[in-house]
Amino acid sequence: MISFIGGTGPEGKGLALRFALAGEPVVIGSRDLGRATDAALEVQRLAPKASVEGSLNPEAAERGDLVFITVPFSGHRDTLEGLREQLRGKIVVDTVVPIAFEERRFRALVVEEGSVAEQAQLVLPESRVV
């Protein structure tokens, strides 16, 4: 099972769709069950033979053998800290990009730990972050 934490945005749904089309069962997680369910139904419509479910982030993290993190950078650390137990021993693919969108422009953000992946590994010492 492949899970997407914060999977209701364009990146999470797009990745979930590609894996679903390839025959992988996926779970789309969100802080809001309704949004997760809606995103799963949207992916299911595009991949009708696929196994696609929506759930709250903790359940998605628990169920995934491979877990993608697709949240905005502003919520990255807090999201991971809240899922530390569920992500223990898991392979975590962190797709988060440290950028802000301000006044119609993107701005790169400095990550104190050096990179988003390094931050994730420090927050999730018992997970394998890639």
Each predicted region: which residue ranges?
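A generic structural signal for alpha->beta connector loops
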Residues: 23, 49-51, 89, 126-129
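NAD(P)+-binding Rossmann beta1-loop-alpha1 motif at the extreme N-terminus of oxidoreductases
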Residues: 1-45
